[in-house]
Amino acid sequence: MSWDVVVWGGGTGGAAAAVQAARKGARTLLLTPGPWLGGMLSAAGVCAPDGHELSCWQTGLWGQFIRTLADESPEGLDHNWVSCFGFRPEQAEQLLQRWVMQLPSLEWRSGCELLDLQRRGDRIQSIQVGCQGSTQTIHGAQWIDGSDLGDLIAMADAPYRWGWEAQETWNEPSAPDRRRLDQDAFFTEQPVQSPTWVVMGQLSGECPAQSSQTP
């Protein structure tokens, strides 16, 4: 069976790509290794996204995602100090699964393993996946890698972009211009993303006495 769009991986990008492709009328197949959708927003528990406080960024599918969660959460989303909004991981999971199930042109198969891939020239023709106890051959016109580690890209030996993009490339207002990329040491020292620091402490000896005070 051949599909208009085949998405490998159900991370945040993979789930969004599958939903949006199906909404545009494409016969879409979503293949995921695990039984969950959403990646960082659900399975990884990163449910207090930062950097999205500006309403002008809350557009498209992301805007619909946030507004739907807000409408369905009586307690609201503004109850954490990390971000202007936060939600429980299962809320993200349930919403994404509901969107997937509502689309007749989108089929989701979970518990899949990427086994092999066939190319003709520079195009993927088909893939073999182990899924639900059988080996299946999948044909598609368009392929999207929505996995965490680029499984499909690596197997296809496909070219990919890594690192910062200049403002001139896509006319992205917030991106650094080409001159800054070439001359500012920050962009060579941090070629992918600014670091996220985590501070951990280790107790030695006995644990401190529990306080008798009540909050």
Predicted regions and their residues:
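Beta1/beta-strand and adjacent pyrophosphate-binding region of the FAD-binding site
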Residues: 1-11
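Conserved N-terminal/central alpha/beta ligand/cofactor-binding core
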Residues: 20, 26-27, 32-116, 120, ...
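Buried hydrophobic packing segments
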Residues: 17-21, 152
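N-terminal Rossmann-fold NAD(P) dinucleotide-binding loop
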Residues: 14
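Membrane-embedded transmembrane-helix bundle of lipid-linked glycan/lipid transferases
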Residues: 6-8, 17, 122, 140-142
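Loop/turn elements at helix/coil->beta-strand transitions in domains of secreted/extracellular proteins
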Residues: 2-4, 24-27, 104-107, 140-141, ...
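Alpha-helix N-cap/helix-initiation motif
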Residues: 10-11, 85, 133-136
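Flavin (FAD/FMN)-binding glycine-rich loop and adjacent Rossmann-like elements that form
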Residues: 40, 65, 70, 110-111, ...
